[in-house]
Amino acid sequence: MVLSGEGTATPKLADGQVEAIRVIKIARNTAVKAHTTAMITLKAVLVTAPDDLREQLEPLTDHQLILACAELDRSGNIADPAVAIRHSLASLARRYLDLHEEIRIHSNHLKQLTTAAAPQMLERFGVGFDTAAEMLITAGDNTDRVRSEAAFAKLCGACPIPAGSGKTSGRHRLNRGGNRQANAALYRVVIVRMRWHPPTIAYVERRTAEGLSKKDIIRCLKRFVARELYQLLPEPSNPPEAQIAA
């Protein structure tokens, strides 16, 4: 439909603060993945380390392990496996620390940008800067392109899909479409609220008594959160004027 010129959907604009949030979040997400990979790889290398080094490092916490590995002596003949392992552990640990600092910088930028773009959204229970960023990215800079909260829920993959048949009615199933990152963000909000938010806890108890499964209750709650957050999206005609330092 898009290539034929017959599409009716309004495309996202990429000229505002939400686009800045999107590209910063891409950098942060890739850094987080690399950060996790560095720790997993370091522990895998440690398994094959010499016994004395492994016995020294294995009891440490993750934070202590990273700091200890970063200070390992890397001098010696690199052809010696023991030296090569120390070199590898030190390199992975320093990479982990560098990525940790990079993630901190990206997170600070995202917090500032989302606070400037949608401060009311961040005040809602269970909504952090990462969730707010996903909601803003899903809607785009021109939030008026999403005509209704139902359309926004569909974008987030949170709208109900009828699953009835000739023998059943009123049943729905999970929506596997939409923006899966936004759907995951809604899921995190719901899980937090199911544990700590009294109105949500009461809702879960009531719906459970009515015979709904936990999966169906979560589906209903994601739809509610999508409706709630849609109403807090910023107006496209009034972009924030806050200046964010790089």
Positions of the model-derived regions?
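Phosphate-backbone recognition surface of nucleic-acid-processing proteins
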Residues: L122-E123, F129-E210, K214, A242-Q243
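Short alpha-helix plus adjacent loop in nuclease-associated cores
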Residues: M1-D15, E19, L60-E71, T168-G177
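Short helix-capping/linker segments at secondary-structure and domain boundaries
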Residues: G5-T10, A38-T41, H100, R104, ...
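Amphipathic alpha-helical segments in well-ordered regions
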Residues: V45, A185, V189, F224-L232
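Basic, amphipathic alpha-helical segments enriched in Lys/Arg and hydrophobic/aromatic residues
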Residues: T208-A245
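Glycine-rich, often acidic, oxyanion-interacting loops/wings at catalytic, nucleic-acid
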Residues: A20-Q120
